[in-house]
UniProtKB/Swiss-Prot annotation:
Transmembrane segments: none annotated. GO terms for biological process: fatty acid biosynthetic process; lipid A biosynthetic process. Disulfide bonds: none annotated. This is 3-hydroxyacyl-[acyl-carrier-protein] dehydratase FabZ. Gene3D superfamilies: Hotdog Thioesterase (3.10.129.10). Its main location: cytoplasm. CDD domains: FabZ (cd01288). Keywords: Cytoplasm, Lipid A biosynthesis, Lipid biosynthesis, Lipid metabolism, Lyase.
Length: 154
């Protein structure tokens, strides 16, 4: 595995189509193309737009956004695997199976996002993913992706 931080925000913007307020990965701590795994990080702050309504008196990061941050971390790895096709293809999050929410994520938490792909093909991929705050698992599940030509989205 490459040592941290191997990919910072500026390079992430070249690997993901997401932008503020929907970019939910701050940096990649490590990745291994041979093992098809990645570890990334999201620093959760009180300034996140979703905390305005979820919930003002007791802010908790919505579970669906924890899953989205996992999908984005996995998408970074797909972007690295695509390498030469990165500008032509896009990874789309298709779905999640076996999703479990185990621990609340609050302002000030550092969310560690890890994913390991069991399948990567020209059509997409499947990955096991886990989001943790410290040693506590916040959420986990099996993610599915499709790889599509960007031109087909026009």
């Amino acid at each position: 595995m490459k040592e941290a931080p191997v990919i910072k925000l500026r390079e992430l913007l070249n690997l993901l189509p997401h932008r503020y307020p929907f970019l939910l990965v701050d940096k990649v701590l490590s990745y291994d193309l041979e093992k098809r795994s990645i570890v990334a990080q999201k620093n959760v702050t009180i300034n996140e737009p979703f905390f305005v309504g979820h919930f003002p008196e007791a802010p908790i990061m919505p579970g669906v956004l924890i899953l989205e941050s996992l999908a984005q971390a996995a998408g970074v790895l797909l972007g690295l695997v695509l390498e030469n096709d990165r500008n032509k293809r896009l990874a789309l999050f298709l779905g999640i199976q076996k999703a479990k929410f185990r621990h609340a994520v609050r302002p000030g938490d550092i969310l560690t996002l890890s994913a390991e792909f069991s399948l990567i093909s020209s059509k997409g991929g499947k990955a096991s993913a886990r989001a943790c705050v410290g040693s506590q698992v916040a959420a986990e599940g099996e993610l599915s992706f499709a790889l599509v030509d960007k031109e087909s989205l026009d």
